[in-house]
Amino acid sequence: MILLLVLALGLAGASPLGEYKECPPHSRPWQVNLHDGKMSCSGALIDRWWIVTSFDCALTAHRTIATLGDHDLTVEEGTEQHIPVAEVIVHSPYRSPLHSLTMVRLAQPAQFNQHVQPVPLASRCPQPGEICSVSGWGSTRPNHFEPQQRLKCITVPVVDDQTCVNTFPQYLYWSQHMVCAGRADTDNCMSNRGSVMVCGGQLQGVQWFNHGCKDPAHPSVYSKMCLYNDWIHQVMARHPPFETTTVSTTTRGRKD
């Protein structure tokens, strides 16, 4: 009941279409900040041991900390859980043209409370026109790459595949494992790896590619999470957590 209430409140607090706003504090309890002292990116907590993020966020395990329950990156609010990363599993091959996804295993389990909750995996695929919420700490201004201090949110419509293909960069390949969201006056141009897209209370996208704030008329591309449930469960089964564990970085392909 607590999780459902938090999810409902979180999506209800999303910004009006086309406008970036600060998320209501702690309204996205699944949002994770991954950082290694040099760079940071977003991810989604899906289990007390596991985070899913983009390939671009495949940081080195032994140097990376996952911060859960955060809102303002510059202030310790007392809600944060800072947990070392134990293992990083990259879905390969990357952009070949199939996948851009990484799973991160925590060295210690997350402690669920009102500020830290997992987001449910997708039980269906998103539909064109469906309105979703995207959140992340990335910059929303051109040529500014420093992370925002506070978590930002925007609501975006899912775009049909053909419209997305028509705006897709020639140097990337279109794949059925992608989903696009955004339009000319509402796009996710956050320069934040692993920004999270939630539709109807379910994890439907992790940012794969966007055109940046210089070109917001084109939709952003996300990994289509509804097609990755089998892979996610395979990774979790093959890499069982331990209360005390060594750290490593691993690359694994999908078992077909």
From Swiss-Prot:
GO cellular component: secretory granule
PROSITE patterns, A to Z: TRYPSIN_DOM
Any one GO molecular-function label of the UniProt entry: serine-type endopeptidase activity
Disulfide bonds: C23-C153, C41-C57, C125-C226, C132-C199, C164-C180, C189-C213
Domain Peptidase S1: 15-237
Gene3D superfamilies: Trypsin-like serine proteases
SMART domains (UniProt xref): Tryp_SPc
Key words of the record: Disulfide bond, Serine protease homolog, Signal
Gene Ontology biological process terms from the UniProt entry: proteolysis
SUPFAM superfamilies according to UniProt: Trypsin-like serine proteases
Keyword Disulfide bond belongs to the record: yes
InterPro entries associated with the record: Peptidase_S1_PA (IPR009003), Peptidase_S1_PA_chymotrypsin (IPR043504), Trypsin_dom (IPR001254)
Signal peptide range in chain numbering: 1-14
Family: Belongs to the peptidase S1 family.
PANTHER family linked: KALLIKREIN-1 (PTHR24271:SF47), KALLIKREIN-RELATED (PTHR24271)
UniProt protein name: Trypsinogen-like protein 3
Organism encoding this protein: Pseudopleuronectes americanus
